[in-house]
Structure formats: C-alpha cells, structure tokens
Swiss-Prot record:
Protein's UniProt keywords contain Secreted: yes
Lineage, top ranks: Eukaryota, Amoebozoa, Evosea, Eumycetozoa, Dictyostelia
Residues that carry a glycan: N25
Record keywords, A-Z: Glycoprotein, Secreted, Signal
Intracellular or extracellular location(s): Secreted
Protein name per UniProt: Secreted protein D
Domain of life: Eukaryota
Leader sequence segment: 1-22
GO cellular component: extracellular region
Organism of provenance: Dictyostelium discoideum
C-alpha cells in the first residue's frame, strides 16, 4: 500500500516538474493571471474561470497575424461594430433619438412640400409656414447634434489635443483611469470583448471596442 502511495506521489511530482519546466510559458501565464486577478479583485469581483481561460487564449494569440489575416469583410464587420458600439454608448436611447429625428425630418419635408405647392395654399398658410420654418430647422440641428457624429468628433478632438500637448502616455493614463472608474460598464464590455476575440466574431469585437470608446467619451464631460 505504501509503495502504491509513493508511486502515485512520484507520478504527481513528475507531472508537476514537467508542467513547470517543459511548459514554463503556460505556467507563467497562469500565475500571471492569478496575480492579476488578486490585484484587481476589487475591480473584477465577479471574474469567472471562463474569463481566465479567455485571457490565457488571447495571450497565446499572435494578434499581428490575426490582423494581417483579416479579410475585407472582416474589416467591414469590425468597422460597423465599432460604429454601433460607439452609438450605443454615447447615446443610450438610439431608437428614441432616431424616431425623434425621423419625425422632425418628416415635418421639414412637409414644409418643403407645401412651399413647392405654394399656389395650392393660402397666403396666410404660407406666412405661418415661414414663421415656423426656423424653429423646425433649429430642432433638426439639435437632433443631428444629439444623434449624429458632432459630439463624437468634438470629443475625439479633445483626445487629440491631450495626445498632442501632453503626450501619448498621458492619454493612456487618462484612458486607464476613465475605464477603471466605470467598473459597472467595464466588466461586461471586457468579458464580451475577450469572448469575441477568442471566437473571431469581428462585428461583436467592434461593438465592444466601440463601447470602450463610448466609456471614454462619456467620462469626458467636464
């Protein structure tokens, strides 16, 4: 019985030595993961074994090769995903925004239609249209500012100013602090990004990258 027990222990030791010395890279990755998790326990209180496995798989990937192997369709999917994720983060109610915009555009189109049929309406009706026309245009501009790219472009300009005046490292520190200060949004976005990268779902990968950017944009409101 003791010999059997010693044999079992010997097998276990051989396995452990092989794991440490022959697969040193994998072991160091696992240890790094554990240290990272311990260090970021407050930030990631609900981290799972699947998250750890995704991180390990991503660390083994050659991301440069993945980028080089992306097809034109993959790049398009990534771009569409980034746009969708950014729109989702910057504007949390896109359907409501788009519906309001569509209603305003319909109203504007109706004004143009009525003016083009000027002789079919009375002078008083035309004067009324002229009076409300500036208001409709103003509402359109307001909605375009809220739903369109103007807000995004302005904030990209602010980030570019940080990089130009303070350097890339300062922007990286700013981005890290901005992301870490939003753990409620950061955790599910990070989890989705890891899963999308492992499965090579480029459109969803783009969505999560866009959500990351949205977190940065939303944190820059001062």
């Amino acid at each position: 019985m003791k010999i059997y027990y010693l044999f079992f222990v010997l097998i276990y030791l051989i396995y452990f030595i092989n794991l440490v010395y022959c697969e040193k890279n994998d072991t160091s990755i696992i240890l790094d993961d554990i240290l990272d998790i311990q260090h970021n326990r407050k930030l990631f209180p609900k981290i799972t074994h699947q998250d750890i496995e995704n991180i390990r798989q991503i660390r083994r990937m050659n991301l440069h090769s993945i980028v080089k192997s992306m097809s034109t369709l993959n790049v398009q999917d990534l771009g569409l995903g980034i746009f969708a994720g950014l729109e989702k983060s910057v504007n949390p109610n896109p359907n409501e925004c788009i519906d309001s915009l569509r209603t305003s555009i319909d109203n504007t189109n109706q004004v143009f239609y009525d003016i083009s049929n000027f002789f079919g309406i009375t002078i008083q009706e035309f004067l009324t249209l002229i009076q409300i026309f500036p208001t409709i245009i103003k509402d359109d501009i307001r909605l375009y500012d809220a739903c369109g790219a103007n807000v995004i472009v302005m904030k990209i300009g602010k980030f570019a100013h940080i990089i130009r005046t303070e350097g890339l490292q300062s922007f990286a520190n700013y981005a890290k602090n901005a992301l870490y200060s939003n753990p409620f949004y950061l955790i599910p976005v990070t989890r989705g990004l890891l899963e999308s990268l492992v499965t090579k779902n480029y459109q969803m990968l783009g969505v999560h990258i866009g959500e990351y950017l949205g977190i940065l944009f939303n944190s820059d409101d001062d």
